[in-house]
Amino acid sequence: MSTSSKPRKFTAPKGVPDYVPPNSHEFNAVRSTFHHCATVAGYEPVELPIFEDTSLFARGVGESSDVVTKEMYTFEDRGGRSMTLRPEGTAGVMRAVIEHGLDRGQLPAKLVYAGPCFRYERPQAGRYRQFQQVGVEAIGVDDPALDAEVIALAYRCFTSLGLMGFRLELTSLGDSTCRPAYREKLQAFLTSLPLDEETQHRAQINPLRVLDDKRPEVKEMTADAPLMLDYLSDEARAHFETVTGILDDLSVPYTINPRMVRGLDYYTKTCFEFVHDDLGAQSGIGGGGRYDGLMAELGGRDLSGVGFGLGVERALLALETEKKTVTDGSRVEVYGVAMGEEAHRRMPVIINDLRQSGVRADMSYGHRGLKGSMKAADRAGARFALVIGEDELAKSIVQVKDLHEGEQTAVPLDQVVQEVRGRLSA
């Protein structure tokens, strides 16, 4: 006797989250808030592919970075080409700017993007192997006022979400005239330490990366390492002082962290990160900086740029720790409850009229009965329920029930759209 096995039940891969209602509304709210903050500052949207030539990220992000050496999802396509799911957004934006000649139009080219990125990391709270990033890039002008604009934009985004427990850390990573001397000093210091072989090798390739090492023993050994802020050129120092001065004028609070090292190798001059201490060791919720040599490194003109990226999941986790919620405004406002066959035929017309007037409306399907339909209205998050039965049809009225206050009012059928719109706008 043969037995049939149940079909396999699929689940999302490890570290790859789903966002379903109601959480998807908060997810969209973070993205839309950032997009609004960017567009009012003159940033234009750009849509990019989620995979690119692997060498774009190797050259753009930095071959010695952990992102490139340990975390990228790389595959060979059927044409034998090495492709990589994007681990961050900036390199792809720069490639698009070069390819489509945006660097030869009005500068700075100010762009805003959003979409998934991929890194093979150990999944933990707010950090996933697929994560959503929103960001801005301002390309083509070396102006400290632009650095300050990007930082202030990010700050406004977090405050617009209602976050309060975050802080801004800021530093300068110098420029091409002062970094070589600092690099020599730092390498000499690191060579004198009893570091393991892999870390010593990293110190020779990119000594700044050692300062980003999270291991307690390495952090202790490098506590007295020379700091980039002590080696800034006059130009880099003036740039940094102008940035901080404008932030002071804009009332954007910050602390200077001379030991800050971002996880990507392309940053120069201004470098910043927003952190939320309630998130523990992995406290970053967004960051960015200036990258003056990146476009030339990717085959374009030698133009500067500055940008910022926000991790949507990190922002959601910060909101959760502060016990705050946000919404994207897409929940249903009005829910139709029809009792009886004729009412069920009439309700779609009413719901359609509401939708055409701009009201977010839905109705109960499947003849659930009054109790089940009212529960569905509550679950949908509706403010008002419209109830129609045989008696209401006979009188050409609709019962409008306020689900927040519990009040119910009879409204003429031909006035229901006007009545509901008025109550929603009150």
UniProtKB/Swiss-Prot annotation:
Keywords: Aminoacyl-tRNA synthetase, ATP-binding, Cytoplasm, Ligase, Nucleotide-binding, Protein biosynthesis. CDD domains: HisRS-like_core, HisRS_anticodon. One of its GO terms (biological process) is histidyl-tRNA aminoacylation. It holds the Pfam family tRNA-synt_His. The keyword Aminoacyl-tRNA synthetase applies. It catalyses: tRNA(His) + L-histidine + ATP = L-histidyl-tRNA(His) + AMP + diphosphate + H(+). InterPro entries: aa-tRNA-synth_II, aa-tRNA-synth_II/BPL/LPL, Anticodon-bd, Anticodon-bd_dom_sf, His-tRNA-ligase, HisRS-like_core, HisRS/HisZ, HisRS_anticodon. Its EC number is 6.1.1.21. It is an enzyme of class 6 (ligase). Its main location: cytoplasm. The keyword Flavoprotein does not apply. One of its GO terms (molecular function) is histidine-tRNA ligase activity. Gene3D superfamilies: Anticodon-binding domain, Bira Bifunctional Protein, Domain 2. It is found in: Cytoplasm. PROSITE patterns: AA_TRNA_LIGASE_II. GO terms for cellular component: cytoplasm. Homodimer. Belongs to the class-II aminoacyl-tRNA synthetase family. This is Histidine--tRNA ligase. It comes from Corynebacterium kroppenstedtii (strain DSM 44385 / JCM 11950 / CIP 105744 / CCUG 35717).
